[in-house]
Amino acid sequence: MFFLPLYDENPSKRPPIITWAFIFICFIVFMYQFNLPQRLEIGFVYKYAFIPDYLSNYYIVSNLAPINPLITLITSAFLHAGWMHILGNMLYLWIFGDNVEDSMGKFKFFIFYILCAISGSLLQYYSNPSSDIPIVGASGAIAGVLGSYLILYPKAN
C-alpha cells in the first residue's frame, strides 16, 4: 500500500526557511526545465543530472563535460523527471522537513540535506558505476529527512 502523508501533528517552533527555500528552488528549476523545448531540456538534464559513468571516468570526462561530474552530485537533486516526481518529493519535504530543520537548526539542516542528496547519488553510483542514464531528483535527500524524522520523532502521528 502506498503511504501518502497529508500532515503531521508536530508543530514546528520556528519558520522552516531552509525547507521552504529547497522547495522553492526545486519548483523554479522544474518550471524552467519543464518550459524548455524538448531538445534543450534533454541538454539541460544531461548537463546537470548525475551520470554515474561520468564519475567513473572522471579524469577523462572532467575536461570534456559541460559541468564537473562532482558538482552534479548536488545539482541533480534539484532536477525532477515529471510532475508526480516533484510533487511527491516536495510533499514529503514540506510535511517532515520543518520538524527536522527545527530540531537541527537552519545551518545544520542545510548541510544535512545536501549531504543526503550527495549520499543518494553515490549509493546509485555504487549500484551501477558504468550507467550512462541521468539520475535526477531529491529522493536521496528526502530519504535522509524521513529517516531523521523517524529517529527524532518515533511516536509522532
Give short role names for the model-derived ranges.
Residues 1-157:
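A detector for small-residue-rich transmembrane helices and their helix-helix packing motifs
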